[in-house]
């Protein structure tokens, strides 16, 4: 009889956990999503940790939107988090819209000037700045992606553009679509065609993930005489924490509240 009641209780616990997870995934209010994810996790649903982490990314990342931080001694700022497509069933409407904006920017369909203006302001750069853009897989992609943004900074911010300071020597595989992105040599298809001695450079790119591209490009700019004043990004890829870390945060919050 005790075994029957135990399995009966476990059955309804699983049903409750599933219902809470679905409620959280569909909730529009942030606090409701957070509460439902927390309750589903404590009820034992295997996907609840993912929902909670994606609902509260700032709880699991030391590098926050529009707050300067450093990578390889380079002062960096990004506008918001980007979430991989495999997480799109667990993010809210605003997060999905921003992720879609990143895709549009990559395709040259949205200059995202309002987001880059926010990152530029948060970086608090000195005067006499030149912006240079992260080289792409092809010259066509490079100019489609960055030419409108370069014009925006020149017209509305008075910032000199270095968009033509690099020349493309060929094409390389796109890191965005490659299955072996870590093996791609970013500097294999371009050269810096201008002496940058004395220029203070802010690097502009769409997405910060590992920081490998940033470090590689910054080195080439320094080798050409530039001083790196900072880097701004449209987004930073949110890396999902382990389930154990999420559970620790949730249960700690529960017992301390």
Predicted regions and their residues:
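Alpha-helical solenoid scaffolds that mediate protein-protein interactions
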Residues: 2-5, 23, 40-43
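Residue at a conserved register position within TPR or TPR-like alpha-solenoid repeats
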Residues: 6-7, 20, 27
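TPR/TPR-like alpha-solenoid signature
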Residues: 14, 18-21, 34, 50
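TPR/TPR-like (Sel1-like) alpha-helical repeat modules
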Residues: 34-47, 53
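Active-site-facing substrate-recognition patch
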Residues: 50-128, 167-195, 237
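Short glycine-rich phosphate-binding loop at a beta-alpha junction
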Residues: 128-137
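Glycine-rich phosphate-binding loops at beta-strand->alpha-helix junctions
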Residues: 136-144
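PRPP/pyrophosphate-binding module of the type I phosphoribosyltransferase fold
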Residues: 164-257
């Amino acid at each position: 009889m005790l075994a029957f009641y135990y399995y009966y209780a476990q059955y309804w616990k699983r049903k409750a956990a599933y219902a809470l997870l679905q409620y959280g995934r569909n909730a529009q209010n942030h606090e409701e999503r957070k509460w439902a994810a927390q309750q589903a996790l404590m009820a034992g649903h295997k996907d609840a940790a993912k929902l909670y982490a994606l609902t509260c990314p700032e709880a699991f990342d030391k590098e926050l939107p529009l707050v300067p931080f450093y990578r390889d001694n380079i002062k960096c700022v990004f506008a918001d988090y980007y979430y991989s497509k495999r997480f799109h069933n667990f993010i809210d409407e605003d997060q999905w819209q921003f992720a879609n904006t990143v895709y549009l920017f990559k395709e040259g369909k949205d200059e995202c000037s309002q987001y880059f203006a926010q990152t530029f302001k948060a970086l608090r750069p000195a005067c006499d700045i030149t912006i240079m853009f992260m080289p792409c897989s092809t010259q066509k992609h490079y100019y489609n992606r960055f030419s409108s943004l370069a014009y925006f900074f020149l017209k509305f911010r008075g910032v000199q553009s270095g968009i033509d300071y690099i020349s493309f020597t060929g094409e390389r595989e796109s890191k965005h679509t490659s299955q072996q992105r870590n093996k791609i040599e970013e500097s294999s298809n371009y050269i810096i065609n201008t002496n940058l001695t004395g220029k203070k450079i802010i690097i502009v790119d769409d997405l910060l993930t590992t920081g490998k591209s940033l470090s590689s490009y910054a080195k080439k700019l320094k080798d050409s005489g530039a001083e790196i004043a900072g880097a701004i990004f449209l987004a930073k890829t949110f890396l999902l924490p382990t389930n154990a870390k999420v559970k620790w945060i949730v249960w700690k919050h529960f017992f301390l509240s």
